[in-house]
Structure formats: C-alpha cells, structure tokens
Amino acid sequence: MSALSSCFNGSDSRWDPPYPKADVRRLMGTYSPDFPSWPKLIVWWNETFLTFSDGPWVVSQMRRLGVLDGKDSGELIILVQDMYPDVCPLINRARYDGTYKWTSEMMRKILRMHTIMTPESPVILLDWTNQLRDICKKVDALLWGQDVRGPAYYAVRTTAHFFTEFKDHRIHCIGMSLGGTVCAALSRQLLVRTEGQKRLAA
C-alpha cells in the first residue's frame, strides 16, 4: 500500500482506511460521471468511413443504417485512439511527440483492414477527444492541484455507452498508447454495468 500511496499527494481520501476504493461501484461514480459530450465512434461501411456519436441511441442508429447487418459472430472489436492533449491545457506532459496526429490516419487504415478481415464482427474506432475536452472544462485545477495534470486522470474517466449493448459478445479492446488505459477503464465499467460481464480482452 505504501508504494501505491506514494503515487498520490495525500488528498485522495479513497486511499485512507477503511479503503472505500475497494468499493468498485462507488469508485465508478467518481471516475465515470455523466458528461454531455460522447466519444466518436467510427466504422468502415459501404466503402466509406461513418462517424457516430456514442449514446443510448447509437446502436439502434447503426442497425437502422445496416451497419451491423451480418455481424453475428458474437465478437466485437474496439480500437481506441490515442489522447489528443491539445484540447486540454491542464495536462502536464513531458515531450509531446504528436502521436495522436500521426496515428489518426493509421488507426483508420487499421479500422478498414480489420473490418475487411473480420466481416462477421463489428469493428469500431473510438475517439475520445470530445470527452477529454469536456472533462477538462469541468476540472477545477486550483482545487485538485497536480492530480489533474497527468494524462491518465482523463483516460480513466472516458465512458462508452455502446459497450453495454454488446454485453453478450466477446469484446476485444485494442488501444493506441493511452488508448490502452481507456480500454482498461472501459473494461472496469463493463464489469460493473453488466453485473459480472467477463468476456472482454483489453
């Protein structure tokens, strides 16, 4: 516990006895509040890229358009884009290498390739830039101090509603750089929201 505690500045009471951090549902309420902005969901369909906004309606919208027709393998592949830190001035980063910008097109190519290679499985690229921008606007930097300076603070607060629509699927989540942290956060959310869903590989 001492090694973990050293990662924090001591202001996070969840690490104090009796360790309420162990209460996953309570932790979910802190890490995953409701934000007005949803992440973008990008698919390759009918020889073009389509972009959707995640939310309670998005899977029904995809079905109406025929995007999910024939996708009955029981597998769902999620690709998660890297963080785009330019939209949040609070982030304290070391050397910025522009990973988001130079991998965005590559991730779309991977999306297209994976969709063609696995025609019976939905393949979705998740871009969480909108949520990152929204979370950043709601942060009180003076109150939270350095806690909000690290990129992981934002990555673990990313939410995705459409995951719960595929609770009977085996879900594979593949993240680029900090997108991997988003995969871990979404895995935890899915575990809580579907009451024990364990068919997710991140």
From Swiss-Prot:
InterPro entries in the cross-refs: AB_hydrolase_fold (IPR029058)
Name of this chain's protein: Uncharacterized protein ORF18
Source species of the chain: Fowl adenovirus A serotype 1 (strain CELO / Phelps)
